[in-house]
Structures are given as C-alpha cells and as structure tokens.
Regions:
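Active-site-proximal loop/short-helix segments
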Residues: 1, 90-98
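Long, well-ordered, tryptophan-enriched scaffold segments
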Residues: 1-3, 9-44
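Substrate-binding rim/cap in mid-to-C-terminal beta-strand-loop elements of soluble/periplasmic
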Residues: 2, 74-75, 112-180
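A long, amphipathic alpha-helix that forms part
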Residues: 6-12, 17-21, 48-86, 96-98, ...
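Loop/turn elements at helix/coil->beta-strand transitions in domains of secreted/extracellular proteins
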Residues: 26, 82-88, 155
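Short helix/loop capping segments that flank catalytic or ligand/cofactor-binding pockets
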Residues: 28-29, 99-100, 153, 170
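Short glycine/proline-rich turn/loop motifs
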Residues: 38-55, 162-168
C-alpha cells in the first residue's frame, strides 16, 4: 500500500486542508467551479490505480529530493555566514503536468519508442512516465485545471523569496509575480 493509493481526489482535498492550516488560502475555501477532467479514481481499474499511484510516488520523491538539495544549499549558506546577505528565489514551473506518459499505454507512441514503461521499470533508466491528469489537478488545488490551460491551476505556481537582510520572513503574499 502506497502513500497515494487513496487517489487524486483524496489528495486534492488533503492539500486544500493543509493549505488552509498553513494560511496559504483562507479557511473555508471551497473547490468552487471544480469540474474534474480526469476519470474519477473509483472508476479506474485496479491496474490503472496501481500505475497512477506509483507514478505519483515517484514524482513526489523527485520533489522531495529537490527540496532536500535546496536545503543543503541553504544550510551551507547559513554555516558560512552568507545566508542573511543572499537573495534566494525559487519559482516553480506553471501548473501540474497532465501528461499520461507511461501510466496510460495508449498515451503517445513517442512515449513508448525506445522506452521501458513496464510497471517494474517505473522511475528507472529508459522509463518515461508522468503522473497523469488526476494528480495534476490535485497538484494545483485549490485551483482548477493544470499546465497548458488558461485557468489559475495552469498559470499559478509556488514560489518563495528569502532575503533576510531586507525582507522580513514568515508572510504569505498573493501579489502577482512574473519571471518574464
């Protein structure tokens, strides 16, 4: 049993609840105007659920590794006395990817040529997988849709700025930011 075996609908609700607790979105925020584009989790076959769940576990582990690596840089800056005078800017790519690569064998011929997307090879060399539409929708909660759409889920992305010498920490800003 994996962390994401409950599916993307459950994960979406968990993320909204956590975002409320952290003050990122107002308490009592709803998933208004949310019309899931992905097949409901309970309508997927057990094999489909297994593939999507495993792909999401791999995706999450990549993010966890990135987070740990950024932490190592921050730790180094702190240990060497440079953190207070260093501007740290992190910006995520827009929206969650809805690609079905690897999880849906019919997704694209391009995703299967010279690939081994067997379940046993997920996340290993020669695999080319993504976590699919449902987990992309969960990734952008509480917003609607995902990457490549003109909705908040496709346009908004997480970011943070830290510059202890000039910016007080601990605040959440909803100010529009563009890196273009």
């Amino acid at each position: 049993s994996g962390r994401y075996d409950g599916g993307y609908d459950l994960l979406r609700q968990e993320r909204v609840t956590q975002a409320e607790k952290l003050g990122v979105i107002p308490e009592g925020a709803t998933l208004a105007n949310y019309e899931p584009l992905a097949t409901p989790w309970n309508e997927l076959s057990l094999e489909q659920q297994r593939r999507y769940s495993r792909a999401q576990e791999i995706y999450a582990s990549v993010l966890e590794y990135m987070d740990m690596s950024i932490g190592r840089i921050i730790d180094y800056l702190e240990e060497t006395g440079q953190l207070d005078n260093t501007l740290v800017l992190f910006a995520s790519d827009h929206g969650g990817s809805a690609s079905e690569s690897g999880v849906d064998p019919a997704a694209s011929l391009r995703d299967t040529v010279n690939r081994d997307n067997s379940f046993e090879n997920f996340g290993r060399p020669m695999s080319y997988i993504d976590h699919g539409e449902g987990f992309a929708e969960a990734a952008t909660a509480p917003f609607r849709d995902y990457k490549a759409t003109l909705s908040e889920g496709g346009l908004r992305a997480a970011s943070f700025i830290s510059y202890p010498a000039a910016i007080p920490g601990g605040d959440v800003s909803h100010t529009f930011l563009s890196l273009m």
